[in-house]
Amino acid sequence: MAASYSCRRTCEACSTRAMAGCVVGEPASAPGQRVTLLAIDGGGIRGLIPGTILAFLEARLQELDGPDARLADYFDCIAGTSTGGLITAMLAAPGDHGRPLFAASDINRFYLDNGPLIFPQKRCGMAAAMAALTRPRYNGKYLQGKIRKMLGETRVRDTLTNVVIPTFDVRLLQPTIFSTYDAKSMPLKNALLSDICISTSAAPTYLPAHCFQTTDDATGKVREFDLIDGGVAANNPTMVAMTQITKKIMVKDKEELYPVKPSDCGKFLVLSVGTGSTSDQGMYTARQCSRWGIVRWLRNKGMAPIIDIFMAASSDLVDIHAAVMFQSLHSDGDYLRIQDNTLHGDAATVDAATRDNMRALVGIGERMLAQRVSRVNVETGRYVEVPGAGSNADALRGFARQLSEERRARLGRRNACGGGGEGEPSGVACKR
Protein backbone atom coordinates (compact mmCIF):
# COMPACT_ATOMS: atom_id res chain seq x y z
CA MET A 1 0.00 0.00 0.00
CA ALA A 2 1.28 3.50 -0.75
CA ALA A 3 2.99 5.03 2.26
CA SER A 4 0.62 8.01 2.31
CA TYR A 5 -2.23 5.73 3.33
CA SER A 6 -1.50 5.06 6.98
CA CYS A 7 -2.79 2.25 9.14
CA ARG A 8 -5.22 4.79 10.63
CA ARG A 9 -6.70 5.44 7.19
CA THR A 10 -6.93 1.72 6.52
CA CYS A 11 -8.84 1.15 9.75
CA GLU A 12 -11.34 3.86 8.85
CA ALA A 13 -12.09 2.17 5.55
CA CYS A 14 -12.25 -1.24 7.18
CA SER A 15 -15.29 -0.06 9.14
CA THR A 16 -17.60 -0.30 6.16
CA ARG A 17 -19.11 -3.12 4.21
CA ALA A 18 -19.03 -1.21 0.94
CA MET A 19 -16.04 -1.87 -1.29
CA ALA A 20 -13.83 -2.88 1.59
CA GLY A 21 -11.06 -3.96 -0.72
CA CYS A 22 -10.45 -1.13 -3.21
CA VAL A 23 -7.03 0.46 -2.84
CA VAL A 24 -5.31 2.52 -5.52
CA GLY A 25 -1.91 1.26 -6.49
CA GLU A 26 -2.45 -2.36 -5.48
CA PRO A 27 -2.50 -5.04 -8.18
CA ALA A 28 -5.99 -6.19 -9.08
CA SER A 29 -5.10 -9.73 -8.05
CA ALA A 30 -3.92 -8.75 -4.55
CA PRO A 31 -6.10 -10.52 -1.95
CA GLY A 32 -8.01 -8.08 0.20
CA GLN A 33 -8.10 -5.37 -2.48
CA ARG A 34 -11.02 -6.37 -4.72
CA VAL A 35 -14.71 -5.62 -5.03
CA THR A 36 -16.68 -8.87 -4.97
CA LEU A 37 -20.10 -8.94 -6.63
CA LEU A 38 -22.78 -11.61 -6.96
CA ALA A 39 -25.57 -10.93 -9.48
CA ILE A 40 -28.69 -13.11 -9.89
CA ASP A 41 -31.10 -12.92 -12.84
CA GLY A 42 -34.87 -12.90 -12.70
CA GLY A 43 -36.96 -15.85 -13.83
CA GLY A 44 -39.82 -16.74 -11.49
CA ILE A 45 -39.87 -20.38 -10.41
CA ARG A 46 -36.61 -20.81 -12.32
CA GLY A 47 -34.99 -19.35 -9.20
CA LEU A 48 -34.40 -23.02 -8.43
CA ILE A 49 -31.54 -22.92 -10.94
CA PRO A 50 -29.42 -20.23 -9.21
CA GLY A 51 -30.51 -21.73 -5.88
CA THR A 52 -28.80 -24.97 -6.86
CA ILE A 53 -25.66 -23.22 -8.10
CA LEU A 54 -25.32 -20.94 -5.07
CA ALA A 55 -25.77 -23.86 -2.68
CA PHE A 56 -22.81 -25.53 -4.41
CA LEU A 57 -20.68 -22.39 -4.05
CA GLU A 58 -21.54 -21.94 -0.38
CA ALA A 59 -20.73 -25.59 0.32
CA ARG A 60 -17.27 -25.05 -1.19
CA LEU A 61 -16.77 -22.00 1.03
CA GLN A 62 -17.79 -24.06 4.05
CA GLU A 63 -15.18 -26.65 3.15
CA LEU A 64 -12.58 -23.88 3.23
CA ASP A 65 -13.75 -21.76 6.17
CA GLY A 66 -16.12 -23.83 8.28
CA PRO A 67 -19.84 -24.66 8.42
CA ASP A 68 -20.92 -21.15 9.44
CA ALA A 69 -19.68 -19.58 6.19
CA ARG A 70 -22.41 -17.72 4.29
CA LEU A 71 -22.32 -15.95 0.92
CA ALA A 72 -22.99 -12.57 2.54
CA ASP A 73 -19.66 -12.95 4.37
CA TYR A 74 -17.78 -12.90 1.06
CA PHE A 75 -19.58 -10.57 -1.35
CA ASP A 76 -19.34 -6.80 -1.02
CA CYS A 77 -22.56 -6.57 -3.01
CA ILE A 78 -25.34 -9.00 -3.90
CA ALA A 79 -27.67 -7.87 -6.69
CA GLY A 80 -30.85 -9.52 -7.88
CA THR A 81 -33.85 -8.82 -10.07
CA SER A 82 -37.31 -10.37 -9.70
CA THR A 83 -36.80 -13.86 -8.28
CA GLY A 84 -33.11 -12.93 -8.05
CA GLY A 85 -34.10 -10.01 -5.82
CA LEU A 86 -35.94 -12.40 -3.54
CA ILE A 87 -32.86 -14.64 -3.34
CA THR A 88 -30.75 -11.55 -2.63
CA ALA A 89 -32.96 -10.70 0.33
CA MET A 90 -32.77 -14.26 1.65
CA LEU A 91 -28.98 -14.19 1.52
CA ALA A 92 -28.45 -10.67 2.91
CA ALA A 93 -31.30 -9.95 5.35
CA PRO A 94 -30.40 -10.39 9.02
CA GLY A 95 -31.85 -13.38 10.82
CA ASP A 96 -31.08 -14.75 14.27
CA HIS A 97 -27.94 -13.48 16.01
CA GLY A 98 -27.15 -11.11 13.16
CA ARG A 99 -26.49 -13.88 10.67
CA PRO A 100 -28.12 -14.20 7.24
CA LEU A 101 -31.78 -15.18 7.18
CA PHE A 102 -31.13 -18.09 4.79
CA ALA A 103 -28.19 -20.29 4.00
CA ALA A 104 -27.86 -20.84 0.26
CA SER A 105 -28.79 -24.48 0.83
CA ASP A 106 -32.22 -23.32 2.09
CA ILE A 107 -33.18 -21.42 -1.06
CA ASN A 108 -34.48 -24.37 -3.05
CA ARG A 109 -36.58 -25.57 -0.13
CA PHE A 110 -38.30 -22.16 -0.13
CA TYR A 111 -39.21 -22.54 -3.81
CA LEU A 112 -40.24 -26.19 -3.53
CA ASP A 113 -42.49 -25.49 -0.54
CA ASN A 114 -43.97 -22.19 -1.68
CA GLY A 115 -43.80 -22.29 -5.49
CA PRO A 116 -47.11 -24.17 -5.95
CA LEU A 117 -48.85 -21.65 -3.66
CA ILE A 118 -47.31 -18.61 -5.35
CA PHE A 119 -48.14 -19.97 -8.81
CA PRO A 120 -51.18 -22.25 -8.35
CA GLN A 121 -51.66 -24.31 -11.49
CA LYS A 122 -55.14 -23.55 -12.81
CA ARG A 123 -57.10 -25.47 -15.36
CA CYS A 124 -57.23 -23.99 -18.81
CA GLY A 125 -60.53 -22.92 -20.27
CA MET A 126 -62.38 -20.06 -21.87
CA ALA A 127 -63.12 -18.41 -18.51
CA ALA A 128 -59.47 -18.54 -17.49
CA ALA A 129 -58.40 -17.19 -20.88
CA MET A 130 -60.80 -14.27 -20.64
CA ALA A 131 -59.71 -13.52 -17.07
CA ALA A 132 -56.08 -13.39 -18.18
CA LEU A 133 -56.98 -10.55 -20.56
CA THR A 134 -58.37 -8.36 -17.80
CA ARG A 135 -56.17 -9.01 -14.75
CA PRO A 136 -52.89 -10.64 -13.69
CA ARG A 137 -52.77 -14.40 -13.84
CA TYR A 138 -52.06 -14.60 -10.08
CA ASN A 139 -53.34 -12.30 -7.34
CA GLY A 140 -50.01 -12.30 -5.51
CA LYS A 141 -51.58 -12.45 -2.04
CA TYR A 142 -49.73 -15.56 -0.92
CA LEU A 143 -46.37 -14.26 -2.18
CA GLN A 144 -46.88 -10.87 -0.55
CA GLY A 145 -47.87 -12.42 2.77
CA LYS A 146 -44.94 -14.83 2.72
CA ILE A 147 -42.44 -12.08 1.96
CA ARG A 148 -43.82 -9.79 4.67
CA LYS A 149 -43.72 -12.56 7.25
CA MET A 150 -40.20 -13.56 6.25
CA LEU A 151 -38.65 -10.07 6.15
CA GLY A 152 -40.73 -8.26 8.76
CA GLU A 153 -39.62 -4.67 9.37
CA THR A 154 -36.16 -5.11 7.83
CA ARG A 155 -35.22 -2.15 5.66
CA VAL A 156 -32.78 -2.12 2.80
CA ARG A 157 -30.11 -0.32 4.83
CA ASP A 158 -30.23 -3.13 7.43
CA THR A 159 -28.83 -5.83 5.14
CA LEU A 160 -25.69 -7.66 6.22
CA THR A 161 -23.92 -6.80 2.99
CA ASN A 162 -24.75 -4.25 0.31
CA VAL A 163 -27.65 -5.17 -1.96
CA VAL A 164 -28.87 -3.77 -5.28
CA ILE A 165 -32.41 -4.59 -6.46
CA PRO A 166 -33.87 -3.04 -9.65
CA THR A 167 -37.56 -2.23 -10.09
CA PHE A 168 -39.47 -0.15 -12.65
CA ASP A 169 -41.76 2.77 -11.78
CA VAL A 170 -44.80 2.77 -14.07
CA ARG A 171 -45.83 6.28 -13.03
CA LEU A 172 -42.45 7.84 -13.83
CA LEU A 173 -41.69 5.38 -16.65
CA GLN A 174 -38.14 4.83 -15.45
CA PRO A 175 -36.16 2.26 -13.49
CA THR A 176 -35.96 2.68 -9.72
CA ILE A 177 -32.91 1.03 -8.20
CA PHE A 178 -32.91 0.25 -4.49
CA SER A 179 -29.55 -0.23 -2.83
CA THR A 180 -27.96 -0.26 0.58
CA TYR A 181 -25.62 2.44 -0.71
CA ASP A 182 -28.48 4.88 -1.44
CA ALA A 183 -30.54 3.92 1.61
CA LYS A 184 -27.78 5.05 3.97
CA SER A 185 -27.79 8.60 2.61
CA MET A 186 -31.31 8.95 1.14
CA PRO A 187 -34.04 8.19 3.72
CA LEU A 188 -36.75 8.15 1.05
CA LYS A 189 -34.96 5.21 -0.63
CA ASN A 190 -34.72 3.26 2.65
CA ALA A 191 -37.82 1.18 1.94
CA LEU A 192 -38.92 -2.00 3.63
CA LEU A 193 -37.09 -4.90 2.04
CA SER A 194 -40.44 -6.68 1.77
CA ASP A 195 -41.91 -3.88 -0.37
CA ILE A 196 -38.86 -3.97 -2.63
CA CYS A 197 -39.06 -7.75 -3.08
CA ILE A 198 -42.79 -7.65 -3.82
CA SER A 199 -42.17 -4.90 -6.38
CA THR A 200 -39.27 -6.50 -8.22
CA SER A 201 -41.29 -9.73 -8.46
CA ALA A 202 -44.37 -8.06 -9.99
CA ALA A 203 -43.95 -9.36 -13.54
CA PRO A 204 -46.54 -7.79 -15.87
CA THR A 205 -49.44 -10.12 -16.74
CA TYR A 206 -48.35 -12.54 -13.98
CA LEU A 207 -48.48 -10.58 -10.70
CA PRO A 208 -50.01 -7.20 -9.76
CA ALA A 209 -48.00 -3.99 -9.58
CA HIS A 210 -47.12 -2.78 -6.10
CA CYS A 211 -47.53 0.67 -4.56
CA PHE A 212 -46.04 1.91 -1.29
CA GLN A 213 -44.70 5.05 0.36
CA THR A 214 -41.60 5.97 2.32
CA THR A 215 -41.18 8.86 4.75
CA ASP A 216 -38.18 10.95 5.76
CA ASP A 217 -38.71 11.37 9.50
CA ALA A 218 -36.33 14.33 9.62
CA THR A 219 -38.13 16.43 7.01
CA GLY A 220 -41.58 14.86 6.85
CA LYS A 221 -41.26 14.36 3.11
CA VAL A 222 -43.13 11.42 1.58
CA ARG A 223 -42.34 9.56 -1.63
CA GLU A 224 -44.69 7.21 -3.45
CA PHE A 225 -43.48 4.30 -5.54
CA ASP A 226 -45.62 2.59 -8.23
CA LEU A 227 -43.53 -0.39 -9.22
CA ILE A 228 -43.36 -3.52 -11.35
CA ASP A 229 -40.74 -6.17 -12.02
CA GLY A 230 -37.26 -4.73 -12.53
CA GLY A 231 -36.74 -7.36 -15.21
CA VAL A 232 -38.36 -5.12 -17.82
CA ALA A 233 -35.27 -2.90 -17.50
CA ALA A 234 -32.49 -5.03 -15.99
CA ASN A 235 -33.30 -8.72 -15.75
CA ASN A 236 -29.57 -9.33 -15.39
CA PRO A 237 -28.51 -6.84 -12.68
CA THR A 238 -24.74 -7.14 -13.15
CA MET A 239 -24.15 -3.76 -14.80
CA VAL A 240 -26.69 -1.99 -12.59
CA ALA A 241 -24.78 -3.17 -9.54
CA MET A 242 -21.41 -2.22 -11.03
CA THR A 243 -22.82 1.23 -11.80
CA GLN A 244 -23.99 1.64 -8.21
CA ILE A 245 -20.56 0.66 -6.91
CA THR A 246 -18.77 2.92 -9.38
CA LYS A 247 -21.05 5.80 -8.38
CA LYS A 248 -19.93 5.36 -4.80
CA ILE A 249 -16.31 5.37 -5.94
CA MET A 250 -16.81 8.58 -7.95
CA VAL A 251 -18.36 10.55 -5.10
CA LYS A 252 -15.31 9.60 -3.00
CA ASP A 253 -17.17 9.23 0.27
CA LYS A 254 -14.09 9.26 2.47
CA GLU A 255 -15.98 7.98 5.46
CA GLU A 256 -16.71 4.78 3.59
CA LEU A 257 -14.30 4.22 0.73
CA TYR A 258 -10.64 4.02 0.07
CA PRO A 259 -9.58 6.85 -2.29
CA VAL A 260 -9.96 4.96 -5.56
CA LYS A 261 -10.22 5.97 -9.18
CA PRO A 262 -13.40 5.34 -11.20
CA SER A 263 -11.23 3.55 -13.78
CA ASP A 264 -10.24 0.89 -11.24
CA CYS A 265 -13.04 -1.45 -12.32
CA GLY A 266 -10.36 -4.05 -13.02
CA LYS A 267 -10.59 -4.75 -9.30
CA PHE A 268 -14.05 -6.32 -9.64
CA LEU A 269 -14.53 -10.04 -9.08
CA VAL A 270 -17.98 -10.88 -10.46
CA LEU A 271 -20.17 -13.98 -10.41
CA SER A 272 -23.32 -13.64 -12.54
CA VAL A 273 -25.87 -16.47 -12.33
CA GLY A 274 -28.67 -16.84 -14.86
CA THR A 275 -32.00 -18.64 -14.64
CA GLY A 276 -31.82 -20.18 -18.10
CA SER A 277 -33.33 -19.10 -21.42
CA THR A 278 -34.44 -20.52 -24.75
CA SER A 279 -32.29 -18.44 -27.10
CA ASP A 280 -30.41 -21.41 -28.58
CA GLN A 281 -33.60 -23.39 -29.16
CA GLY A 282 -35.50 -20.88 -31.27
CA MET A 283 -38.71 -19.80 -29.59
CA TYR A 284 -40.65 -17.96 -32.29
CA THR A 285 -40.32 -17.11 -35.97
CA ALA A 286 -41.03 -13.86 -37.78
CA ARG A 287 -43.66 -15.74 -39.83
CA GLN A 288 -45.50 -16.63 -36.61
CA CYS A 289 -45.17 -13.20 -35.01
CA SER A 290 -46.28 -11.38 -38.15
CA ARG A 291 -49.79 -12.75 -37.62
CA TRP A 292 -50.05 -11.89 -33.92
CA GLY A 293 -52.23 -9.18 -32.47
CA ILE A 294 -52.33 -7.84 -28.93
CA VAL A 295 -53.73 -11.03 -27.43
CA ARG A 296 -51.09 -13.37 -28.89
CA TRP A 297 -48.24 -11.06 -27.90
CA LEU A 298 -49.52 -11.12 -24.33
CA ARG A 299 -50.46 -14.79 -24.11
CA ASN A 300 -49.37 -17.68 -26.29
CA LYS A 301 -49.20 -21.32 -25.23
CA GLY A 302 -49.03 -20.45 -21.56
CA MET A 303 -46.31 -17.82 -22.01
CA ALA A 304 -46.22 -14.04 -22.40
CA PRO A 305 -44.02 -13.53 -25.49
CA ILE A 306 -43.62 -9.76 -25.24
CA ILE A 307 -42.52 -9.98 -21.59
CA ASP A 308 -40.23 -12.95 -22.25
CA ILE A 309 -38.59 -11.11 -25.15
CA PHE A 310 -37.98 -7.94 -23.12
CA MET A 311 -36.42 -9.85 -20.25
CA ALA A 312 -34.29 -12.14 -22.42
CA ALA A 313 -33.02 -9.15 -24.40
CA SER A 314 -32.18 -7.32 -21.18
CA SER A 315 -30.20 -10.26 -19.78
CA ASP A 316 -28.29 -10.98 -22.98
CA LEU A 317 -27.32 -7.38 -23.67
CA VAL A 318 -25.97 -6.98 -20.15
CA ASP A 319 -23.92 -10.15 -20.51
CA ILE A 320 -22.46 -8.94 -23.81
CA HIS A 321 -21.68 -5.53 -22.31
CA ALA A 322 -20.02 -7.04 -19.25
CA ALA A 323 -18.04 -9.53 -21.32
CA VAL A 324 -16.71 -6.80 -23.61
CA MET A 325 -15.76 -4.62 -20.65
CA PHE A 326 -13.83 -7.35 -18.86
CA GLN A 327 -12.15 -8.44 -22.09
CA SER A 328 -11.05 -4.87 -22.78
CA LEU A 329 -9.48 -4.75 -19.31
CA HIS A 330 -7.78 -8.12 -19.91
CA SER A 331 -9.70 -9.37 -16.87
CA ASP A 332 -11.77 -12.14 -18.46
CA GLY A 333 -11.04 -14.43 -15.53
CA ASP A 334 -12.60 -11.97 -13.09
CA TYR A 335 -16.08 -12.38 -14.62
CA LEU A 336 -17.86 -15.72 -14.45
CA ARG A 337 -21.29 -16.00 -16.05
CA ILE A 338 -23.21 -19.27 -15.56
CA GLN A 339 -26.19 -19.59 -17.90
CA ASP A 340 -28.01 -22.22 -19.97
CA ASN A 341 -29.68 -21.15 -23.22
CA THR A 342 -31.26 -24.50 -24.09
CA LEU A 343 -34.42 -24.51 -21.96
CA HIS A 344 -37.67 -25.62 -23.55
CA GLY A 345 -41.21 -26.56 -22.57
CA ASP A 346 -42.31 -25.97 -18.98
CA ALA A 347 -38.72 -25.38 -17.88
CA ALA A 348 -38.66 -22.19 -19.96
CA THR A 349 -41.72 -20.68 -18.25
CA VAL A 350 -41.62 -18.52 -15.12
CA ASP A 351 -44.65 -20.03 -13.42
CA ALA A 352 -44.82 -23.80 -14.07
CA ALA A 353 -44.58 -24.68 -10.37
CA THR A 354 -45.52 -28.33 -10.74
CA ARG A 355 -43.57 -30.91 -8.76
CA ASP A 356 -42.20 -32.47 -11.93
CA ASN A 357 -41.03 -29.17 -13.40
CA MET A 358 -39.48 -27.97 -10.14
CA ARG A 359 -37.50 -31.20 -9.89
CA ALA A 360 -36.46 -30.70 -13.51
CA LEU A 361 -35.25 -27.16 -12.75
CA VAL A 362 -33.08 -28.43 -9.90
CA GLY A 363 -31.70 -30.99 -12.35
CA ILE A 364 -30.96 -28.22 -14.86
CA GLY A 365 -28.99 -26.36 -12.19
CA GLU A 366 -26.99 -29.51 -11.48
CA ARG A 367 -26.42 -30.01 -15.21
CA MET A 368 -25.17 -26.43 -15.53
CA LEU A 369 -22.57 -27.15 -12.85
CA ALA A 370 -21.26 -30.01 -14.97
CA GLN A 371 -21.22 -27.98 -18.21
CA ARG A 372 -18.00 -26.47 -19.52
CA VAL A 373 -17.33 -22.83 -18.72
CA SER A 374 -18.72 -20.74 -21.58
CA ARG A 375 -18.40 -17.13 -22.56
CA VAL A 376 -20.66 -15.08 -24.79
CA ASN A 377 -19.36 -14.46 -28.31
CA VAL A 378 -19.89 -10.74 -28.74
CA GLU A 379 -20.34 -11.14 -32.50
CA THR A 380 -23.02 -13.84 -32.44
CA GLY A 381 -24.45 -13.52 -28.93
CA ARG A 382 -24.00 -17.29 -28.53
CA TYR A 383 -22.17 -18.97 -25.69
CA VAL A 384 -19.00 -20.81 -26.64
CA GLU A 385 -16.86 -23.03 -24.44
CA VAL A 386 -13.65 -21.54 -23.06
CA PRO A 387 -10.77 -23.91 -23.96
CA GLY A 388 -9.09 -25.41 -20.93
CA ALA A 389 -11.39 -23.70 -18.42
CA GLY A 390 -12.99 -26.89 -17.10
CA SER A 391 -16.55 -27.15 -15.83
CA ASN A 392 -18.63 -24.51 -14.08
CA ALA A 393 -18.20 -26.55 -10.90
CA ASP A 394 -14.42 -26.32 -11.32
CA ALA A 395 -14.69 -22.57 -11.89
CA LEU A 396 -16.81 -22.16 -8.75
CA ARG A 397 -14.24 -24.08 -6.71
CA GLY A 398 -11.62 -21.62 -7.92
CA PHE A 399 -13.99 -18.73 -7.25
CA ALA A 400 -14.52 -19.99 -3.71
CA ARG A 401 -10.77 -20.06 -3.14
CA GLN A 402 -10.46 -16.46 -4.33
CA LEU A 403 -13.32 -15.36 -2.08
CA SER A 404 -11.80 -17.16 0.89
CA GLU A 405 -8.40 -15.58 0.25
CA GLU A 406 -10.04 -12.17 -0.04
CA ARG A 407 -11.82 -12.60 3.27
CA ARG A 408 -8.74 -13.89 5.06
CA ALA A 409 -6.67 -10.97 3.77
CA ARG A 410 -9.23 -8.48 5.04
CA LEU A 411 -9.36 -10.16 8.43
CA GLY A 412 -5.58 -10.10 8.58
CA ARG A 413 -5.47 -6.43 7.67
CA ARG A 414 -8.08 -5.63 10.28
CA ASN A 415 -6.22 -7.52 12.98
CA ALA A 416 -2.98 -5.78 11.99
CA CYS A 417 -4.72 -2.45 12.57
CA GLY A 418 -5.72 -3.51 16.06
CA GLY A 419 -9.30 -4.43 15.16
CA GLY A 420 -11.20 -7.14 16.92
CA GLY A 421 -13.33 -9.76 15.32
CA GLU A 422 -13.60 -12.38 18.02
CA GLY A 423 -17.22 -13.11 18.73
CA GLU A 424 -18.46 -11.08 15.77
CA PRO A 425 -20.32 -12.62 12.85
CA SER A 426 -17.76 -13.50 10.23
CA GLY A 427 -19.43 -11.21 7.70
CA VAL A 428 -18.94 -8.21 9.97
CA ALA A 429 -15.32 -9.06 10.66
CA CYS A 430 -14.71 -9.60 6.96
CA LYS A 431 -16.22 -6.36 5.77
CA ARG A 432 -14.76 -4.12 8.47
UniProtKB/Swiss-Prot annotation:
Span(s) of short sequence motif DGA/G: 229-231
Domain named PNPLA: residues: 38-242
UniProt entry tagged with the keyword Lipid metabolism: yes
UniProt entry tagged with the keyword Hydrolase: yes
Motif GXSXG in this chain: 80-84
Notes on the domains: The nitrogen atoms of the two glycine residues in the GGXR motif define the oxyanion hole, and stabilize the oxyanion that forms during the nucleophilic attack by the catalytic serine during substrate cleavage.
Function: Possesses non-specific lipolytic acyl hydrolase (LAH) activity. Hydrolyzes phospholipids as well as galactolipids. May play a role in disease resistance.
The name this protein goes by in its record: Patatin-like protein 1
Organism of derivation: Oryza sativa subsp. japonica (Rice)
